[in-house]
Amino acid sequence: MQCPSCQNTDSRVLESRAADAGRSVRRRRECLHCDFRFTTYERVETVPITVLKRNGNRETFNRSKILNGLTLACQKTGLEQDRLESMVNELELQLQQRSGREVNSAEIGEMVLDQLSEMSEVAYVRFASVYRDFRGVNDFVAALEGIHANKEQLAAVR
């Protein structure tokens, strides 16, 4: 590994540990030439996921778009940014584990809404209003009724 300070390629690993819920390895290194200490991360290279948009266009999956949408939807709800990042990590992992490399944006939106419904009704409605393109109050009422119906079904199962 090349030292960021002196560009020497000789370094030793001081410490290694799992990071990002076991999906990467964090290594603390020391340059054998200048004694500079630095951190590296090792991850499995993944095959890109293609998202099929509503208008028929295809684009590479961009986790930051999901995270930005979640951050906006979750403002002033008390949900921590770390929790949102974990949610996006889990979503990306689920997409990577699928056999196909192409996914509809609608499927991604529904996966996000499923997780939000358990975390915050306010965030759910905010995200759904943009994702499902709400046009009026009736759309908001229908979304809230859907949340409550799902909660009642879960309570009946338990």
Curated annotation (Swiss-Prot):
Free-text cofactor note: Binds 1 zinc ion.
Zinc-finger ranges (unnamed): 3-34
Alphabetized PROSITE patterns for the sequence: ATP_CONE
Keyword Nucleus: no
Keywords assigned by UniProt, alphabetized: ATP-binding, DNA-binding, Metal-binding, Nucleotide-binding, Repressor, Transcription, Transcription regulation, Zinc, Zinc-finger
Pfam families, A to Z: ATP-cone (PF03477), Zn_ribbon_NrdR (PF22811)
Domain ATP-cone: 49-139
Any Gene Ontology biological process: negative regulation of DNA-templated transcription
PANTHER family in alphabetical order: TRANSCRIPTIONAL REPRESSOR NRDR (PTHR30455:SF2)
Family the entry assigns: Belongs to the NrdR family.
Protein name: Transcriptional repressor NrdR
